[in-house]
Swiss-Prot record:
Site note Cleavage, residues: C53, A54
PANTHER family documented for this protein: DIABLO HOMOLOG, MITOCHONDRIAL, DIABLO IAP-BINDING MITOCHONDRIAL PROTEIN
Tissue: Highest expression found in heart, liver, kidney and testis.
InterPro entries the UniProt entry points to: Smac/DIABLO-like_sf (IPR009062), Smac_DIABLO (IPR015142)
Domain remark text: The mature N-terminus mediates interaction with XIAP/BIRC4.
Swiss-Prot/TrEMBL keywords: Apoptosis, Cytoplasm, Mitochondrion, Phosphoprotein, Transit peptide, Ubl conjugation
Chief location: mitochondrion
UniProt organism field: Mus musculus
Protein's recorded name: Diablo IAP-binding mitochondrial protein
Oligomer status and interactors: Homodimer. Interacts with BIRC2/c-IAP1. Interacts with BIRC6/BRUCE. Interacts with BIRC7/livin. Interacts with the monomeric and dimeric form of BIRC5/survivin. Interacts with XIAP/BIRC4 (via BIR3 domain). Interacts with BEX3. Interacts with AREL1 (via HECT domain); in the cytoplasm following induction of apoptosis.
Highest taxon listed in the record's lineage: Eukaryota
Compartmental location: Mitochondrion; Cytoplasm, Cytosol
Amino acid sequence: MAALRSWVTRSVCSLFRYRQRFPVLANSKKRCFSELIKPWHKTVLTGFGMTLCAVPIAQKSEPQSLSNEALMRRAVSLVTDSTSTFLSQTTYALIEAITEYTKAVYTLVSLYRQYTSLLGKMNSQEEDEVWQVIIGARVEMTSKQQEYLKLETTWMTAVGLSEMAAEAAYQTGADQASITARNHIQLVKSQVQEVRQLSQKAETKLAEAQTKELHQKAQEVSDEGADQEEEAYLRED
């Protein structure tokens, strides 16, 4: 046992003396070992990061939103929104077109009234000039009328699409979308009806002005005939 202790003591002392004699070699071994394990640490860390990136993130599932009924309600809501937008745009265009037509009608009414008030006070040249203005206004009115009639056809198509979308929303259980679409349809119909009534009122005034102009002209011709007959009668006397 004493011999074993003596051998251990000598070995430790020899190792200590060895490290004191060759410190550079010992440090070199440490550096070599350190350099050896550095890439391994980097590799492990990089691989661990890549592993984390590759793990998919679980998303919360929404079983109710994936049902066929829910998907249909969502789709029909988008349809009602789209048809309502289309209806709004066509309604705006139609109202603007009817308003422009109504203005053109009132312009023609004013010209007819002025012409009627000047009957018998104009020479033939002045009368021709007034008639040229009236003809130009009539052409403008006809052009505006054709434009609004064309838009009216598109507007009626938009109304039909909105009504079908509202019905589809009702059938699929999207009650709120159906109610909103139907209320919107009623609103635009009332707006168009209001401007239509204004245009119809203008057309009535135009018809009255034209009738008055015809009566006035007929009266003027009759008066001229009576004057000629009276003049001829006086000549005979």
